[in-house]
Amino acid sequence: MTPLIFVTGGVVSSLGKGIAAASLAAILEARGLKVTMMKLDPYINVDPGTMSPFQHGEVYVTDDGAETDLDLGHYERFVRTRLSRKNSVTTGRIYENVIRKERRGDYLGATVQVIPHITDEIRRCIDEATEGYDVALVEIGGTVGDIESLPFLEAIRQVRTERGPEKALFMHLTLVPYIGAAGELKTKPTQHSVKELRSIGIQPDVLLCRSEQAVPDSERRKIAQFTNVSERAVISVPDVDVLYRIPSGLHAQGLDEIVVNQLKLADKAGPVDLSMWEDAVDATLHPLDEVTIAVVGKYVDHQDAYKSVGEALKHGGLRQRTKVNLKWLEAQDLEGTDMAALADVDGILVPGGFGDRGFEGKVLTSKFAREQQVPYFGICYGMQAAVVDYARNVVGLEGANSTENDRQSPNPVIGLITEWRTATGDVEKRDDKSDLGGTMRLGLQEQRLKPGTLARELYGKDVVAERHRHRYEFNNRYRTQLEDAGLVIAGKSMDDTLVEVVELPRDAHPWFLACQAHPEFLSTPRDGHPLFIGFIRAARERKAGGKLLSEARA
């Protein structure tokens, strides 16, 4: 059975459990271990798919079409394992599974209770997601003391009791606040957090102490004494200027060695090679160029809603030793303005979204980029905005719109996808009365690129696969009309029914590309993504006055 590392959090939320867990996973992977990760979320939603971006942040989509927590994005950016629906489990899904089993009669008339039925289902999901790996990290969402988290904590307590410390390790992330008036770090919140954890039967093996500054040895000794944790296993995790420093910082304190020794992984784990992360830090701290990218979205007040977009832009810069400054703009605020907010940027990206609020601002942004020759990258809703702009202002289709925003549009150039074929060959059908949750075109889908296009040049191959999350598409009734007016259909689904990529000819615009998929979900600091790398290079060329630049790899 796969050794497990359970990651819990205490004191307050948003301390960075996902980043800390992913950083440890990256170190273990760098030692040659086959690693996977999993998130257990205590909210009752079945998945985050219908949750507000202002509350929950980004919905991250996996290859198999699962709508998951944004922490899975951190996981996939830090480790090479491609995750799936199995790696994201919520209370809602657990209860849904248990109730379905009860209705089928699987429990043979027993009274269904949290213990053992809910906890058994949690354990089954953990086993299913982690089977076949050298080691797995399982993050429990929320903080210790939350009533919603109790079934998950009880389930992992049972796992540890059954498997023993050599097959299950508890790692607890906690806050050590710095009190400026007193000029010192306070360990009491950590002591109480561990006390709460121990009261439900869980004794941490490792403590990760989050703080503004490094926790001194004297405080680490004090924490160890009051929490019954070995001093060497009290790890300081201070704020860092570059995210990619964290794996090296944890390794320097011996965290991976503690894990490898306790879980008896020494025979599989080799010497660590963190050169990739060190190179990423060096490229971030010593850039050779700098650009400013405007991100024109609907949820910019909560930037976690575009977490993967922001990271992918930085990855695109990283591959060229270029610092990418992000200028977040609310699409709605641009409506009725002279677009002066976009005057000083080197490139414009319009990300995904839903609903009519701010859509006209996105259309105006596309128009500005097209007319002012500013590099433009549209993603999902950003592609639809570009198509609407082109239909209205180039082709002259009065009232052109998406039926998502105007069902009575005389020229619905964007419409609801009523039927499409999935990656497995199944035919999916939807209408405007279908449930919102889980009814979109989701997951990894292949597309064929048109020879001679910018998209084909950037990808370097004819067929590519990207992750999708949308229910509206380019209306094929207008395909010929828009192509005749100069819009290039650069990519289509393998059955030729769905438009995947549009662009402008390079003799008409230096870099204007929009795609229906979400390429940000496949970008990593290791490799970047061809579209984001190309977009940042185009922004650099605009800043350099149109001078063609070669890629300076990190």
UniProtKB/Swiss-Prot annotation:
Its EC number is 6.3.4.2. Disulfide bonds: none annotated. It catalyses: UTP + L-glutamine + ATP + H2O = CTP + L-glutamate + ADP + phosphate + 2 H(+); L-glutamine + H2O = L-glutamate + NH4(+); UTP + NH4(+) + ATP = CTP + ADP + phosphate + 2 H(+). Residues 292-545 form the Glutamine amidotransferase type-1 domain. The active site is at C380, H518, E520. One of its GO terms (molecular function) is CTP synthase activity. Mg(2+) binds at D71, E139. UTP binds at S13, K186, T187, K188, P189, T190, Q191, K222. GO terms for cellular component: cytosol. Residues 1-265 are annotated as: Amidoligase domain. ATP binds at S14, L15, G16, K17, G18, I19. CTP binds at S13, D146, I147, E148, K186, T187, K188, P189, T190, Q191, K222. CTPSs have evolved a hybrid strategy for distinguishing between UTP and CTP. The overlapping regions of the product feedback inhibitory and substrate sites recognize a common feature in both compounds, the triphosphate moiety. To differentiate isosteric substrate and product pyrimidine rings, an additional pocket far from the expected kinase/ligase catalytic site, specifically recognizes the cytosine and ribose portions of the product inhibitor. Homotetramer. Belongs to the CTP synthase family. HAMAP family: PyrG (MF_01227). This is CTP synthase. The gene is pyrG.
